[in-house]
Amino acid sequence: MGTTYKQSGVDIEAGDAFVERIKPHAARTMRPEVMGGVGGFGGLFALPPGKYQQPVLVAGTDGVGTKLKVAFAAGRHGTVGIDLVAMSVNDILTCGAEPLFFLDYFATGRLEVDDAAEVVKGIALGCEQAGCALLGGETAEMPGFYARGEYDLAGFCVGVVERAAIIDGKSVKPGDALIGLPSSGLHSNGYSLARKVLLDDGKLALDATPEGLDRPLVDALLEPTRIYVKDVLALLQAVKVKGLAHITGSGIPGNLPRCLPDGTRAVLSEQTWPKPPIFDLIAKLGSVARDEMFNTFNMGLGLILVVAKEDVAQALSVLSGRGVQAFEVGRVEAGQGEATAVIDP
């Protein structure tokens, strides 16, 4: 008998077993618009006729970054799938889009079916939280390309928004208010710095509970990214939101100006919102400067909305009614040139 594909490191049978394992998870995310099931060459999704007047499709893609390194070290794979979904659906949400469907790409050197199934279980949970269908995906087993026990993830999301309802920041003006929605922690950004400070240089054990934290370090580091979709879509039914920023890599200074017009600047007061203790731990242990912290991490705000000052009370009330404690964190002022964001101590 000649050399087989399995002998070269690609196990087709394991791949087939994996697909069977994840079908029930994908099935839980299905929407009425989905045509067919998991396993086809392409996923089919039919926009219902008459539901939209001028539908505009919005697409986004992202990964989880080196947060995966923490999952590998801890042997915990159940939450990074939520992160994967969150990063893309929160991105397209900034346009006012409702996520419709999601696809994932899972790449590894050797397929460990149990670990991979845990990842996809998390992806399905994230899709449920976002209200979108897990329409399909790709599993790539590439021997010699990844270290044993490691993998990488990429996610792709498509949503829809009415053309007249697109949030583009063009109507933002001086005097408007900024509302911050709290993050659950680091979300999925800044992990290269966090790992260097806490694990490489700080020599902290993942199962340790450092001073200042109320739980083991691994729990704080693997806390999944918050998915804001359902709360914000509900808010959009009650309040005109002029701008939305997903606070990811580059922090507030790098992301908030993306939803502001030129000639304006956002001014935030750091004392107006609470920060998860993981940020203080990183800053203290690594002697990380304040500007570096704000340019790397979300610093406690995962999403920032721009609304008219007179709409602040209603916006906070709507969010509070959904169990979201949001905060008025600043204002929009007149500026010069390209939009900027500053955070006052």
Curated annotation (Swiss-Prot):
- Name the domain of life this protein comes from: Bacteria
Enzyme Commission identifier(s)? 6.3.3.1
Main subcellular localization, coarse class? cytoplasm
Q: Which reaction does it catalyse?
A: 2-formamido-N(1)-(5-O-phospho-beta-D-ribosyl)acetamidine + ATP = 5-amino-1-(5-phospho-beta-D-ribosyl)imidazole + ADP + phosphate + H(+)
What UniProt keywords are attached to this protein's entry?
ATP-binding, Cytoplasm, Ligase, Nucleotide-binding, Purine biosynthesis
Which terms in the GO cellular component ontology are assigned? Answer: cytosol
The entry's localization annotation reads: Cytoplasm
Tell me one GO molecular function of this protein: phosphoribosylamine-glycine ligase activity
Query: Broadest EC class?
Result: ligase
- BP terms from Gene Ontology: 'de novo' IMP biosynthetic process; adenine biosynthetic process
Q: Which Gene3D superfamilies match?
A: PurM-like C-terminal domain (3.90.650.10), PurM-like, N-terminal domain (3.30.1330.10)
Q: Which Pfam families match?
A: AIRS, AIRS_C
Q: In which pathway does it act?
A: Purine metabolism; IMP biosynthesis via de novo pathway; 5-amino-1-(5-phospho-D-ribosyl)imidazole from N(2)-formyl-N(1)-(5-phospho-D-ribosyl)glycinamide: step 2/2
Q: Which CDD domains match?
A: PurM (cd02196)
Assigned protein family: Belongs to the AIR synthase family.
Q: Which NCBIfam families match?
A: purM
- Name of the protein: Phosphoribosylformylglycinamidine cyclo-ligase
Phylogenetic classification of the source organism:
Bacteria, Pseudomonadati, Myxococcota, Myxococcia, Myxococcales
